[in-house]
């Protein structure tokens, strides 16, 4: 099947992937745009895994303060070179992720950051909620509830507030694939007026 340049351009605009990668994805998908996007997203995840071990010493710290002045976020996002750290795309993603933290209140960056004792406590709570269920399905239900917990409390597992078809980790992986560098959110702090105070 011959893939038109218009189709390649359209896919490139949607994903930010290289022309050759777009052409290959479209050929593999038989010209189906949605399948091609999925192929590129999977490739981005594979690229991200390869680059995950590389050192990220450059980056930026962004600050976001909600318009009412009651919520603020500081977020550190790192990459390998200052060249990537200075790009508009990198800065925009970091700023949008700070907005994500302000809106969605994650507690951790990645699921690996959740302490084992917190996970065990959550599992105990879930088991207590479904203690009358047969034992063979209890573990499946507990694992399902734990996944939902991660989607709430881990930034990377959250649905992106500006595009509910993607998770935050998908956006990071797409930028890794596009820049060829390891990129990660290192940490964030969220502030809210009155939070943590009791009378």
Swiss-Prot record:
Cellular component, GO, one term: cytoplasm
Top-level taxon of the source organism: Bacteria
Keyword field contains Protein transport: no
Sample GO molecular function, one term: translation elongation factor activity
Pfam families: EF_TS
Membrane-spanning parts: none
Region named Involved in Mg(2+) ion dislocation from EF-Tu: 81-84
Subcellular location: Cytoplasm
Keyword RNA-binding: no
Protein keywords: Cytoplasm, Elongation factor, Protein biosynthesis
CDD domains listed in its UniProt record: UBA_EF-Ts (cd14275)
InterPro entries xref list: EF-Ts_dimer_sf, Transl_elong_EFTs/EF1B, Transl_elong_EFTs/EF1B_dimer, Transl_elong_Ts_CS, UBA-like_sf
NCBIfam families found in the cross-reference section: tsf
Similarity field: Belongs to the EF-Ts family.
Function description: Associates with the EF-Tu.GDP complex and induces the exchange of GDP to GTP. It remains bound to the aminoacyl-tRNA.EF-Tu.GTP complex up to the GTP hydrolysis stage on the ribosome.
UniProt-listed PANTHER family: ELONGATION FACTOR TS, ELONGATION FACTOR TS, MITOCHONDRIAL
UniProt protein name: Elongation factor Ts
UniProt source species: Thermotoga petrophila (strain ATCC BAA-488 / DSM 13995 / JCM 10881 / RKU-1)
Biological classification of the source: Bacteria, Thermotogati, Thermotogota, Thermotogae, Thermotogales
């Amino acid at each position: 099947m011959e893939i038109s340049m218009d189709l390649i351009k359209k896919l490139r605009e949607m994903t930010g992937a290289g022309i050759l990668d777009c052409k290959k994805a479209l050929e593999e998908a038989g010209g189906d745009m949605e399948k091609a996007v999925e192929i590129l997203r999977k490739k981005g995840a594979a690229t991200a895994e390869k680059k995950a071990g590389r050192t990220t010493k450059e980056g930026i710290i962004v600050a976001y303060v909600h318009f009412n002045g009651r919520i603020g976020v500081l977020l550190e996002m790192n990459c390998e070179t200052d060249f990537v750290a200075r790009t508009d795309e990198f800065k925009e993603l970091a700023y949008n992720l700070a907005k994500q933290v302000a809106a969605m209140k994650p507690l951790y960056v990645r699921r690996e950051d959740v302490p084992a004792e917190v996970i065990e406590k959550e599992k105990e709570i879930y088991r207590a909620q479904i203690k009358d269920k047969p034992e063979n399905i209890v573990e499946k239900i507990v694992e399902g509830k734990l996944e939902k917990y991660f989607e709430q409390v881990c930034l990377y597992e959250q649905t992106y507030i500006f595009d509910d078809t993607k998770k935050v980790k998908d956006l990071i992986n797409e930028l890794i694939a596009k820049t060829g560098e390891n990129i990660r959110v290192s940490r964030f702090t969220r502030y809210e007026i009155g939070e943590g105070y009791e009378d």
